[in-house]
Amino acid sequence: MSYHPGHGHRQEPRKGAGARRGFARPDDSADAPRTGPLIFEERSTENAGAAPPIEEQLKVHNNPYASLNIQQQRIRLPIFKNRGHILYMCERYRTIIIVGETGCGKSTQVPQFLLEAGWAADGRQIVITQPRRVAVVTLATRVAEEKDCILGHDVGYTVRFDDVSDKDTKVKFMTDGLLLREILADPLLSKYSIIMIDEAHERSCNTDILLGLLRKIIQIRNDLRIIVSSATLDAELFKDFFEMNETGNSDKDTAGIISVEGRTHPVAVHHTKTSVPDYCQSAVDTVINIHKHENPGDILVFLTGQDEVEDVCEKLRELAGNLKNCDRLWVVPCYGALPAREQMKAFDSTPHGTRKVVVATNIAEASITIPGICYVIDTGYVKLRAQHAANGVETLMRVTVSKASAEQRAGRAGRIRPGKCYRLYPESEFERFAEGTVPEIQRCQMASTILQLKALGVQNVHRFHYLSPPPSWAMINGLELLYALGAIDETSQLTSPLGLQMAEFPLPPMHSKCLLKSAEFGCSTEMVTIVAMMQIQDVFITPYRQRHQADVIRKKFAVEEGDHMTMLNVFTKFVENGRSKKWCSDHFVNYRGLMRADNVRSQLVRLLKRFEIEKVSSRGLINCSENIRQCLVTGFFSQAAQYHYTGKYMTVKESFPFNMYKGSSIMFKKDYPKWVIFTEVMQDSIRDVTVIEPEWLYELAPHYYEFGTEGELAEKRMRGPAATSAAADDDY
């Protein structure tokens, strides 16, 4: 891969391996849990100073702000004393960069400062963007509570497939991707007086593109103010990007920086002496040891994804039921795919005599602040998407976090009192981590971004003003894919109607192509269900003590044509059984995920109606499965693979080897199919796989592949350059 997130590599730990781990007490005041053999060594974070004596830490057991009413809590936030300065800077500068640690109050208070100062007068709105939907929902809910108003009126939010706002909304939270889409209809974002780009340091692809567009907009709209909010010290990068003053006279600067002190306490950081063989099990053991031996205070555990979070939560709940002479252990999951009501549980006050354990992905690293956290367990891993330079395939990879992310995680333990962070990796490994995470725009598939830019009127995407330019090979791969999909023509202009319609879907281009072509294959009803199901992470759940039962049930849903037909089967049965939560539980199906897919499906149906795509079903037809699978090929022909005698699948383009994902329904087949397409890649495995016939590639993508034997292809190349954008060297 072209993307290397760390300096050096950690040995990949096994999940589900290794014995239970205990802790040995170090010879220092800020001790780790007390049973061994897993040994922790203490290191204090550089910005925290030395931890105070343990007797001082014992004086505070609960959140000192919990007894205050909401307005008193607002006043106590660190950012409140900067209120006047922030409002002055909004008058003085066109762009304001606010640097403040997570938890200082910038995300919830700055919008209220602006509202109170009249920036939402005359029908204008204040909009705040976030990279993640969970942050959008939680922040909007909190601000509405602080303003004592109904969520959706004065304060509202908009995320993909869910709009909780009305025409009178004054403060609106939304994902950065949705604000990008608004520019399609309103290029100058004229209804907004102030646009606040929050969590800009996360450098999502949408955020980077949005910053580039806003830089153009403020040159036209003198009345618009841009606020860029960041939790890390990269303020100069943003200031230089937005600064329009070229005279050298600072009095004419158009961008200014304000730093906000955080409300942090010292955090004692403990590293393991050696690498752990199974970080999920080690995280479970560490939680139990903290709960048995440490003072009151909630725990935050960082894992990489929904499957790990649910697995660890289940183990903790089982162990918690057997604990004696301990306070109650309340286990709460937190990840992006959770419904809003479930996500909000992480923010609920912890009852007396209870310790809350929040098991989260990296959404809890910076986007949201969970109250009451005193202990952090950092596994040192995160899942990121990265594109392979040669074959253009985007992979969801588990990689080590950066040093900046590790410090962010540790800092979550020091919000209300001196805290502790337990890192499940040695300090020597930490020193090999990269300083920061590579911006998403420099490691991901660019087709969606290019499609959006084209729709926004940016014709020369290479010369767009990027905060960090993407690599040229990524731009070329993205343009080639869009051309192959029929979204752009030979001059790189959007095609009509296909390219224009694809740009309006809040989906990756390959997904939207399948939807827009589905009526031609007589399966639009089925395809809208499959595409909706592709937007959720996991269709099935596998409790760690019921794996055999889950596999037996799962096998009943599996069909030999592959995962997408299996998804269709599951959703159909879900609807036939009244969308029952009990039915899902009995069949090890992800109820939360299917409810989300149901909502997404409704939104996609409305879009198809707007584009006058005929509603037609293949159900009951002899060639039903074939129609659906051929329709999938129209979008995912570039991700075709052939079975190799080594047991791997080789991509047709560039002959790149992949394993079959162990959770695929293909694994239930006696023999592996010879040809497949895949719509997702995790690490080195293809998942969400559908069986195809090789002739379909010839029929549906003759413009993308060359066909013939090795000798025929060699002779064709000797005669002249290939007229296609990609060539396959495999025999066909």
Swiss-Prot record:
SMART domains to which the protein is assigned, alphabetical: DEXDc, HA2, HELICc
Motif DEAH box in this chain: 198-201
Similarity-based family: Belongs to the DEAD box helicase family. DEAH subfamily.
Alphabetical keyword list: ATP-binding, Helicase, Hydrolase, Nucleotide-binding
Helicase ATP-binding domain mapped to chain residues: 87-251
Gene name in the database record: ddx-35
Cleavable signal peptide: none
Disordered: annotated span: 1-50
Enzyme Commission number, as recorded: 3.6.4.13
GO molecular function: ATP binding; ATP hydrolysis activity; helicase activity; RNA binding; RNA helicase activity
Known catalytic reactions: ATP + H2O = ADP + phosphate + H(+)
A Pfam entry, by short name: DEAD
Disulphide bridges, residue numbers: none
Residues that hold ATP according to the record: 100-107
Enzyme class: hydrolase
Stored Gene3D superfamilies: 1.20.120.1080, P-loop containing nucleotide triphosphate hydrolases (3.40.50.300)
GO CC entries: catalytic step 2 spliceosome
SUPFAM superfamilies in alphabetical order: P-loop containing nucleoside triphosphate hydrolases
Stated name of the protein: Probable ATP-dependent RNA helicase DHX35 homolog
Domain Helicase C-terminal: 283-457
Organism phylogeny: Eukaryota, Metazoa, Ecdysozoa, Nematoda, Chromadorea
InterPro entries listed in its UniProt record: DEAD-box_helicase_OB_fold (IPR011709), DEAD/DEAH_box_helicase_dom (IPR011545), DNA/RNA_helicase_DEAH_CS (IPR002464), HA2_WH (IPR048333), Helicase-assoc_dom (IPR007502), Helicase_ATP-bd (IPR014001), Helicase_C-like (IPR001650), P-loop_NTPase (IPR027417)
